[in-house]
């Protein structure tokens, strides 16, 4: 492939195919993604339209929208979207009115009966169909000759659900979500019986949390993939789940992460959570932490499951939304309230410890002295796996 700058991508390291080719070398000889992959607005748009649009991107938890008409806006690298619960499930649309382009949903809300544009009060059903066009034909005239409402509904985005998570495919032509998830489903099949996923329920809002990070979303993925930083960034965790207790997880092109062999839940004054019925007794202390590319961080334990949705707001802003799931009544029952709070605070503490690291890497990417860095051939293969996924996708997206 030519290493000449591509006029569509622009001159400089953002466009240089050689920079991406260098990522695809063997781990000990590879270079990481170039700085503009983290610092450039233009790269973010190209990344969104050429990489993220062609796969399945997670945008949130369906369980957070419990009633018909509940809606929530989501911004993906500047692209305004929203999801809304209808009688048949969750629908996802571009967050823009078909009339004059006003944004429809600004904040999480519960809408009664219809989606209403605040500008001229055009209304849409929760299925996206245009229902009302007040005064379109003049005062008191709500229809216009030649105007076909069926052609002006909201623009729906292809979406699917898995483990309560809502995934979207912006391009509309990605392989089925089942194929996308198959390698992960195969990996976790020994731990989960067929009915275990249906037993999972999202904990109440106050048993979850959100962190606002001033950094590129990819840095949060990279940090999550590896256990290398545990002794220095998570000294409390490292006291019982040491670096040597972890193992690496790598599925090229799909996911990467780490596992531990010493997971030990602490309930303090709370009740013990129910456990997955299919979990092998001899692996009860195993827990796995997997970054499912591109943007969801998963934690599977014998007694709970979590999904951190990384919402890439802009090239240097990421929202980390922690969604914790428990089995059966443990998600909402008063009996387990203290146990849920203990679990939430434990995870919040750990993820908060990572904030400074991720933001520090973002600041460091402003330095011309850094050119992607290096990878430990022993400790960094999961992180390198993610870099290769990004680099390969960006190369494939070049005209």
Can you describe what each PLM-predicted range is?
Residues 2-4, 84, 94-95, 160-161, ...:
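C-terminal catalytic domain of Rieske-type non-heme iron oxygenases
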Residues 11-41, 109-121, 155-163, 238-273:
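N-terminal short leaders/motifs
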Residues 64-172, 178-186:
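Rieske [2Fe-2S] iron-sulfur-binding domain
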Residues 53-64, 135-143, 290-294:
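Short Pro/Gly-enriched beta-strand edge/turn motifs at strand-loop
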Residues 55, 77-79, 155, 293, ...:
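Short beta-strand or tight-loop elements
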């Amino acid at each position: 492939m030519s290493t000449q700058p591509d006029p569509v991508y622009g001159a400089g390291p953002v466009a240089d195919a050689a920079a991406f080719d260098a990522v695809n070398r063997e781990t000990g000889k590879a270079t990481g993604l170039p700085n503009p992959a983290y610092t450039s607005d233009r790269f973010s748009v190209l990344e969104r339209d050429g990489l993220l649009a062609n796969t399945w991107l997670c945008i949130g938890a369906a369980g957070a929208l419990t009633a018909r008409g509940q809606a929530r806006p989501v911004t993906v690298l500047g692209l305004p979207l929203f999801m809304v619960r209808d009688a048949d499930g969750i629908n996802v649309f571009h967050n823009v009115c078909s009339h004059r382009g006003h944004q429809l949903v600004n904040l999480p809300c519960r809408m009664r009966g219809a989606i209403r544009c605040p500008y001229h009060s055009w209304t849409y059903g929760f299925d996206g169909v245009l229902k009302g066009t007040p005064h379109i034909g003049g005062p008191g005239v709500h229809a216009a000759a030649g105007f076909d409402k069926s052609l002006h509904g909201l623009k729906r985005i292809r979406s699917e659900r898995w483990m309560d998570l809502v995934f979207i495919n912006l391009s509309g032509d990605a392989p089925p979500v089942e194929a996308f998830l198959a390698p992960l489903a195969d990996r976790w099949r020994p731990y989960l019986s067929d009915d275990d996923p249906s037993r999972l329920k999202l904990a109440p809002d106050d048993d979850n949390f959100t962190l606002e990070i001033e950094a590129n979303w990819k840095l949060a993925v990279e940090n999550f993939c590896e256990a290398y930083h545990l002794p220095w960034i998570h000294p409390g965790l490292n006291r019982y789940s040491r670096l040597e207790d972890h193992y690496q997880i790598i599925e090229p092109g799909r996911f990467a992460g780490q596992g531990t062999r010493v997971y030990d839940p602490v309930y303090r004054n709370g009740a013990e959570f129910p456990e997955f019925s299919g979990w092998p007794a001899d692996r009860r202390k195993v827990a796995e932490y997997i970054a499912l590319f591109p943007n969801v961080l998963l934690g599977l334990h014998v007694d709970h499951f979590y999904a951190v949705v990384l919402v890439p707001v802009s090239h240097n802003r990421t929202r980390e939304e922690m969604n914790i799931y428990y089995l059966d009544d443990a998600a909402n029952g008063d009996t387990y309230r203290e146990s849920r709070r203990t679990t939430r605070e434990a995870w919040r503490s750990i993820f908060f410890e990572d904030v400074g690291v991720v933001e520090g890497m973002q600041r460091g990417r402003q330095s011309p002295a850094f050119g992607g860095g290096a990878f430990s051939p022993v400790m960094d293969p999961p992180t390198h796996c993610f870099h290769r996924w990004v680099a390969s996708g960006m190369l494939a997206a070049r005209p």
